[in-house]
Amino acid sequence: HYAFVFKTSLAHIIHRMCQEKHNVRFVKLSATLAGVNDVKEIVKIAKNEMNLSKRHTILFMDEIHRFNKLQQDIFLPHVESGVITLIGATTENPSFSLNAALLSRCRVFVLEKLSASDISTLLSKAITALNI
């Protein structure tokens, strides 16, 4: 049996929605591969785009729990100032894995695991919607 949460699918859906709105930039990072310097570079570009063209940046950070609580501090001033909108995805309990200051500035959405039946229903609806 496999359990699916579809975090990556959610990121793709958000990315597609951002592409439809030309004033929003979407960046996806994985905390398993990225570091604080990668976030700093994204923030630098986000500040420039915000100042020059009022283009907003959404940062999707997959596996955000892989950043330790000190590393997570990098997000705070930029989330507070509105330079970035942070979407953090994790399979861990955010109450334990996220910095309290960051967590207090977030809304937590719990994505429940989908059963095989749920996935089958979703795929059937997608096939119908796409006329496949």
Label for each model-derived stretch:
Residues 7-8, 36-38, 67-69, 94-100, ...:
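Switch/connector loops and helix/strand junctions flanking conserved nucleotide-binding motifs
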Residues 22-25, 55, 81-84, 103-107:
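Short glycine-/polar-rich loops that comprise or flank the Walker A/P-loop
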Residues 61, 65-94, 100-104:
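Conserved catalytic/switch belt of AAA+ P-loop NTPases
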Residues 115-132:
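Conserved small helical "lid"/interfacial subdomain of P-loop NTPases
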Residues 30-33, 107-120:
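Conserved AAA+ ATPase "SRH/arginine-finger" region at the nucleotide-binding site
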Residues 25-58, 69:
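Short glycine-rich substrate-engagement loop in P-loop NTPases that contacts/grips substrate
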Residues 1-28, 44-47, 76-77, 81:
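Walker A/P-loop
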Residues 28, 60, 85-86, 108-110:
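Structured core elements
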